[in-house]
Amino acid sequence: MYMDIVSLAWAALMVVFTFSLSLVVWGRSGL
């Protein structure tokens, strides 16, 4: 159970990080 929570939290963190990074790149590109 503990590993499932850690894996879920890590996956969520990576999704948020990737989304924010792509959003910044998309904003800087002027689109």
From Swiss-Prot:
Key words of the record: Chloroplast, Electron transport, Membrane, Photosynthesis, Plastid, Thylakoid, Transmembrane, Transmembrane helix, Transport
Gene Ontology terms for molecular function: electron transporter, transferring electrons within cytochrome b6/f complex of photosystem II activity
Compartments, record wording: Plastid, Chloroplast thylakoid membrane
One GO cellular component, as annotated: chloroplast thylakoid membrane
SUPFAM superfamilies per record: PetN subunit of the cytochrome b6f complex
GO biological process, one term: photosynthesis
InterPro entries from the UniProt entry: Cytochr_b6-f_cplx_su8_sf, Cytochrome_b6-f_cplx_su8
Membrane topology (UniProt): Single-pass membrane protein
Transmembrane segments: 5-25
Pfam families (alphabetical): PetN (PF03742)
UniProt subunit comment: The 4 large subunits of the cytochrome b6-f complex are cytochrome b6, subunit IV (17 kDa polypeptide, PetD), cytochrome f and the Rieske protein, while the 4 small subunits are PetG, PetL, PetM and PetN. The complex functions as a dimer.
Described purpose of this protein according to its UniProt entry: Component of the cytochrome b6-f complex, which mediates electron transfer between photosystem II (PSII) and photosystem I (PSI), cyclic electron flow around PSI, and state transitions.
Record family assignment: Belongs to the PetN family.
UniProt protein name: Cytochrome b6-f complex subunit 8
Gene source species: Cicer arietinum (Chickpea)
Taxonomic lineage from the root: Eukaryota, Viridiplantae, Streptophyta, Embryophyta, Tracheophyta
Name of the gene: petN
